[in-house]
Amino acid sequence: SKNVSAPGPGAASYSASKAALNQLMRVLAMEWGNDGIRLNTLHPNAVFDTGIWTDEILEARAKHYKLSVNEYKTNNVLKVEVNSIDVAELAAEMCGSLFAKTTAAQVPVDGGNDRVI
């Protein structure tokens, strides 16, 4: 979750739980590395094509930031909407040979969101 690197107000419990999972991943990467086990985390921004994001929630969040729904969904450096396929494709790629020598990495999938909010 992007809340590890860019937490927001009103999300203390959520942000703390995500940060704890991130730290656990880093420790396990050190402990299991000798066995060839790699652990990495992805930090997506909001993934809008999931059931969590109803029209009502999107409208409320956009209004909170004084943005249109489209502006809210693309409020990042690249001005792109992050969807579940984006996250899934990166997760699958990280299991392959391109990332075979990568462990304990924290990879954002957010279009640069933590740079604008």
PLM features: residue spans?
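A glycine/serine/threonine-rich, flexible loop-to-helix segment
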Residues: 47-75
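Active-site helix of classical SDR
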Residues: 17, 25
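Active-site loop immediately N-terminal to the catalytic Tyr-X3-Lys motif
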Residues: 6-12, 79, 97
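Conserved SDR Rossmann-fold cofactor-binding beta-strand/turn motif
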Residues: 38-48, 108-110
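C-terminal substrate-recognition "lid" of short-chain dehydrogenase/reductases
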Residues: 80-109, 114-115
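Residue(s) in the substrate-gating loop at a strand-loop-helix junction
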Residues: 1
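Short, small/polar-rich loop/turn modules that mediate ligand/substrate recognition or access, typified
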Residues: 33, 38, 102-104
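Catalytic tyrosine of NAD(P)H-dependent dehydrogenase/reductases that use a Tyr as the general acid/base
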Residues: 14, 22
